[in-house]
Swiss-Prot record:
Residues 25-504 are lumenal. This is UDP-GalNAc:beta-1,3-N-acetylgalactosaminyltransferase 2. Its main location: Golgi. It comes from Mus musculus (Mouse). Beta-1,3-N-acetylgalactosaminyltransferase that synthesizes a unique carbohydrate structure, GalNAc-beta-1-3GlcNAc, on N- and O-glycans. Has no galactose nor galactosaminyl transferase activity toward any acceptor substrate. The keyword Ubl conjugation does not apply. The chain crosses the membrane at residues 4-24. Pathway: Protein modification; protein glycosylation. The gene is B3galnt2. Belongs to the glycosyltransferase 31 family. Residues 1-3 are cytoplasmic.
Length: 504
């Protein structure tokens, strides 16, 4: 029996190791909550990784199958067949393990995964934006001569009137007050209402109102209402947290400082309410139809996500070049995707440099390696890219930044491509669960790097815009067809920007 055990043990051990190897190579299930790469390395602490000169991380959205395939058939294919670079570079696409379960039509904006939570909308009637408690003590005559409140429109509305509080101690209206509505970051008011003793408007409940020119404020509009006293006295105002917001069933949201709104220093005057406004909800029939069809739309979307998961699993199994990171794949989560990838590289690979790019970018890896040799780009704590300096912070739109208080970002490299040294990746990976993410991965990197002050190597050949320049290392924002054509021109002439050959 002992002899049989001696013979069987090596076979069992060999089979176990073979199965373990297959398991390591199999693509992760996006819904799997099993062991992470860190857990795997803890089980086998002496496991040896292949060493690479450069790890290339390509940020990619889940549905960008075509862009990934173009890369596999152009610069990645060229790399894999290169006589010297093929063993020196590891390329991985960075994809969120989960898709957003909210259909795009039902999100507050296309860049996040936040549900547009409209229920029982108030239609075909005017709505007072604020309701106030009965106790007069919650209103006070303050020393503040300028008070403001900001809001975001989640479904189109029309503001019909602007209003101000009246002082209960006065007989009639005895003040001179101007009320203005601004679009965020715009210096000129969209419309203005002026209140004075001879022209005080109409009293409704506890406010005096005046009609204003009516504009449809579209979805995603962000504005600020500002009350200004033209007298020496301050305004009668209330703390924002002591009023009830009538949001029309969820068509607008009042933004309070510290709750995702603009930092207080960017608001005009003191945050609060010194009056109100009246509005109506537009396109009510379309809204009701959308709400009625939402359950079916959600069910269809969940089915689509399941199909997408299966396609991604198959793609990963075939190509073995995807890292699924534990985030919901949306634009707002791109910085978190990047931090998760940095952690994966440290836990799962051995390398000297990391190159980050996007799936819509042209990359010339041969030129990158030649440049590294020419410029002697090695050693610790360095960051090589094309840096934007004193870049203004956007407060609205796709690049809206409500978390970073300065008017300009620290220096950051354009996202089309940059290279960082291993020790920087180690620092980012080690602090990945502590680092705050901002609206974009490029500006987030700039803010994170400001803490450690790496040596910056400026190089304009990492292009920031969609242009073609001889010797370029990267260029962004191409369609799959454009990327294929660029690479075909490069293979024909060596320079995609100066090639006169006709591409069939």
């Amino acid at each position: 029996m002992r002899n049989w055990l001696v013979l069987l043990c090596p076979c069992v051990l060999g089979a176990a190791l073979h199965l373990w190897h297959l398991w390591l190579r199999s693509p992760p299930d996006p819904h799997n909550t099993g062991p992470s790469a860190a857990d795997q390395s803890a089980l086998f602490p002496h496991w040896k990784f292949s060493h690479y000169d450069v790890v290339v991380g390509v940020l990619s959205a889940r549905n960008n199958h075509e862009l990934r395939n173009v890369i596999r058939n152009t610069w990645l294919k060229n790399l894999l067949h290169h006589p010297t670079l093929s063993q020196r570079v590891l390329v991985k696409f960075i994809i969120g393990a989960r898709g957003c379960e909210v259909p795009v039509e039902d999100r507050e904006d296309p860049y996040s995964c936040r549900l547009l939570n409209i229920t029982n909308p108030v239609l075909n009637q005017e709505i007072e934006a604020f309701s106030f408690p009965e106790d007069a003590s919650s209103s006070r005559l303050s020393e503040d001569r300028v008070v403001s409140v900001s809001f975001r429109v989640l479904y189109p509305i029309v503001i019909t009137s602007l209003g101000v509080f009246y002082d209960a101690s006065d007989v009639g209206f005895q003040r001179n007050i101007t009320v203005k509505l601004y679009q965020t970051e715009q210096e000129e008011a969209l419309f203005i209402a002026r209140f004075s003793p001879p022209s005080c408007g109409v009293q409704v409940n506890k406010l005096w109102y005046k009609p204003v020119e009516q504009f449809i404020l579209p979805e995603s509009f962000e504005g600020t209402i500002v009350w200004e006293s033209q007298d020496l006295h301050g305004l009668v105002s209330r703390n924002l947290h002591r009023v009830t917001v009538n949001d029309g069933g969820g068509v607008l949201r009042v933004l309070a400082a510290g709750e995702g709104a603009l930092p207080h220093e960017f608001m005009e005057g003191v945050e609060g309410v010194a009056g109100g406004f009246i509005y109506t909800v537009q396109e009510g029939d379309a809204l009701l139809r959308s709400l009625y069809s939402r359950p079916q739309r959600l069910a269809d979307h969940i089915q689509d996500l399941q199909v997408e998961d299966a396609l991604l699993q198959e793609e990963s199994s075939v190509h073995d070049d995807i890292v699924f990171v534990d985030v919901v794949d949306t634009y707002r989560n791109v910085p978190a995707k990047l931090l998760n990838f940095y952690r994966w590289t440290v836990e799962s690979t051995s390398f000297d440099l990391l190159l980050k790019t996007d799936d819509d970018c042209y990359i010339d890896l041969e030129a990158v390696f030649n440049r590294i040799a020419q410029k002697n780009l090695d050693g610790p704590n360095f960051w090589w890219g094309n840096f934007r300096l004193n870049w203004a912070v956007d407060r609205t739109g796709k690049w809206q930044e409500l978390e970073y208080p300065s008017p300009a970002y620290p220096a950051f490299a354009c996202g089309s491509g940059y290279v960082i040294s291993k020790d920087i990746v180690d620092w980012l990976a080690g602090n990945s669960r502590r680092l705050k993410t901002y609206q974009g991965e490029d500006v987030s990197m700039g803010i994170w790097m400001a803490a450690i002050g790496p040596k910056r190597h400026q190089d304009s050949l990492w292009l920031c815009e969609k242009t073609c320049e001889t010797g370029m290392l990267s260029s962004p924002q191409y369609s799959p067809e454009e990327l294929s054509k660029l690479w075909e021109l490069k293979e024909l002439c060596g320079d995609p920007c100066q090639c006169e050959a006709k591409v069939r």
